[in-house]
């Protein structure tokens, strides 16, 4: 194999890894946004919201994730709004459960 061919192979591998990384990051972002929407709909039901009010609340939950990196901003939003309607463990458990649901939905759509 010539030096040029070898370098081309390395460049191809590098591009493939970069593309996979970008795709994985995009899928994680979509999964988190979907999870947050589902969490918002779940919390909206506990708050007695339905229809457009539930959808609007779910959008608020999705937007709350842009405050800081990680899930704590979403947890704080939902926990603060729910008050004593759900425990910390229930909310965090629901976040984990709904992440799996969100990833499954995205895989089904792909």
Located regions from the model:
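A charge-rich, low-complexity, intrinsically flexible signal that marks solvent-exposed coils, linkers
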Residues: 2-110
């Amino acid at each position: 194999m010539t030096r040029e061919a070898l370098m081309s192979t390395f460049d191809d591998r590098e591009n493939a890894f970069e593309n996979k990384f970008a795709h994985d990051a995009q899928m994680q972002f979509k999964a988190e946004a979907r999870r947050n929407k589902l969490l918002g709909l779940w919390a909206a039901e506990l708050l007695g919201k339905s229809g457009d009010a539930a959808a609007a609340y779910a959008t608020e939950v999705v937007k709350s994730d842009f405050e800081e990196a990680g899930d704590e901003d979403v947890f704080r939003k939902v926990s603060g709004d729910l008050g004593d309607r759900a425990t910390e463990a229930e909310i965090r458990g629901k976040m984990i459960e709904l992440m799996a649901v969100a990833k499954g939905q995205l895989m089904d759509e792909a």
